[in-house]
Amino acid sequence: MITRVDHIDMRVADLETAVETLSKVGLEVVRRTPAPRSSVEMRLPGENQVTFEIRPSNGGFEGVHHIAFRQTEPEDVERLKEKGIEFKTEHMLIKDTGRTVSSFSDANGSGWQLTD
């Protein structure tokens, strides 16, 4: 079952400037991952808040890279495939974050994920 938005992955030109700006808005740093990922995860205070994973663009795409939904069952991927969703990755472990993700794009090219 898909239960909520888990995280929003954003790519930025200047990581520390983005972190500083979001800190002023009220988000708090909850984790930094080492290079080469070099991401900073931030959330608003309180329980069950969406995580913003801010990552350097390294000269590439800037903006929202994908939005991830929290899933409770690995079978969620199969259920969506039966409905016509084509996944680019399935049940891939991201070592730096400990998340297992399955990624797909919609007809407009926007990136989406399921994560545990």
Residue ranges and their predicted role:
Residues V30, R55-S57:
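Short beta-strand micro-motifs enriched in acidic
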